């Protein structure tokens, strides 16, 4: 998701999105450990999006 789209969301929506991203990150980690992750770049994408959301949550408070 683009930073512009994230800025349009409310704090509650960002927190919900962060929860979803962390679940996705956990799932990707498990797939990577078991050797079932075909697209390794997804872990990097999720990690960066988590950082974007956390940055926006910190700046709005």
Swiss-Prot record:
GO-annotated biological processes: translation
Coiled coil: none
CDD domains to which the protein is assigned, alphabetical: Ribosomal_L29_HIP
Record-linked InterPro entries: Ribosomal_protein_uL29, Ribosomal_uL29, Ribosomal_uL29_sf
GO molecular function: structural constituent of ribosome
One GO cellular component term: cytosolic large ribosomal subunit
Gene3D superfamilies in alphabetical order: 1.10.287.310
Keywords: Ribonucleoprotein, Ribosomal protein
Cysteine disulfide partners in this protein: none
HAMAP family (UniProt xref): Ribosomal_uL29
Family (UniProt): Belongs to the universal ribosomal protein uL29 family.
Protein name: Large ribosomal subunit protein uL29
Origin species: Xanthomonas campestris pv. campestris (strain ATCC 33913 / DSM 3586 / NCPPB 528 / LMG 568 / P 25)
Lineage: Bacteria, Pseudomonadati, Pseudomonadota, Gammaproteobacteria, Lysobacterales
Gene it is expressed from: rpmC
């Amino acid at each position: 998701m683009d930073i512009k789209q994230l800025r349009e969301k409310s704090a509650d929506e960002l927190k919900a999105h962060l929860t979803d991203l962390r679940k996705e990150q956990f799932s990707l980690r498990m797939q990577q450990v078991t050797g079932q992750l075909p697209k390794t770049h997804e872990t990097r994408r999720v990690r960066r999006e988590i950082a974007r959301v956390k940055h926006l949550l910190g700046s709005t408070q």
